[in-house]
Amino acid sequence: MEEGFVPVAKVADVPPGTMTFVAVERERIVLAHVEGGFYALRDVCGHRNAPLSRGRLDGCIVECPLHFAQFDIRTGKYVDGPYSADVPIYEVRVEGDTVYLKR
């Protein structure tokens, strides 16, 4: 794997249509398996710092569990709700049965 990528999960641990929390060093990240790919974004809604990994995933939209702000898990772009800023995303790669995240 390229330099800068760290292993964060096994492919089998994140079934299609689901998301999970992962930590890389001190960074909280939500990892999702949607539309045949893996996507990662910062696991914090900027509105009240709620963990997005505890929210609801509907297709490619993750919803904050606190005030229901919605973000596209693939791009981090704000979709709807009380908080209108985007969430940072991370580059993800899959090699074999392992999911890697770029730090």
Whereabouts are the PLM-identified features?
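N-terminal pre-ligand scaffold of iron-sulfur
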Residues: M1-G59, I73, D86-R103
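Short cysteine clusters
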Residues: C45, C64-H67
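Short cysteine/histidine-rich metal-coordination sites, predominantly Zn2+-binding motifs
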Residues: G59-P65, Y78-V87
